Amino acid sequence: VHISSSVSFDPEVVGATAARLLRFIRVEHTIFTLPMAYAAALLAGGRMDLWRAVFIGLAVFGLRTAGMSWNNIADYHIDKLNPRTQGRMLVAGKVSFKEAYGVFALGAAVFILSAAALGWWPLILAGPYLLVVVTYPYAKRLHCMPHLHLGLVYALVPLGAAIAMHPEDIETALAKTPWLLVLASALWVAGFDVIYSKGDYEFDRAHGLGSAAACFGIKVADAVAFLFLAASATLYVVNHLVYGLGAAGLLATLAGAALEVYSAILGTRGEVARAFNLNLAVGLLIPLGIFTGLYI
């Protein structure tokens, strides 16, 4: 008797599906988030072993995966109407809703399990963390500064990494958290999001969606973005000095801060693509300054 299975394993199909879903969650953004997480963890002190390093990385990956997939699900009907976002994978039919919900569930599960592996307080805070992340897409429906909500989402990464270094004692964890780095990171992301949202100025105004540009005008949005990014750059430098991270690392920190301010100038000129590329460099230079200061 010959028994055949209707289900076959095709490595090429599996690989193509994995690659497609990784594009859907923009995995490269997660990779650029990790250095800041590890920088915050090391500044918080405690014992960084392989176990902790791996699960901090997995927690970041899981949280961003859940957030990115839910953002696409929640914004589906808006993205269908916006010419700028009509090519997004869920809207374009390259990813199904079933897949999107599956990716969200997987990301949330990876995040919660990683938090549990890191300790008691990371697990307790996993629920509130997810709540902050999944409510972000609705912020622009409610008020004019969803950029601050996105900044908070990003700030959860260095904050969570710091708490993971002292997972059984929340008072010690909060006392050891590099708050200047956390605040600088929040302002960095919020400031750039103000710049990025200018591209949707007319669409947001027509559909009653909130952003600094839509509510207050382009000039005010430019001023807000520059203020946020300049403040962030200043805080990154002050953080370096407060922790006494030394001259060698200070060069990288100053370079990152300078690029951040320059990206703000480019953004106010409408050169968003160039500003975005500079921001990728900022996300590497600031942690590099910290790593160099700690170990060289």
Placement of each model-derived feature along the sequence:
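Multi-pass alpha-helical membrane architecture of UbiA-family
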Residues: 1-296
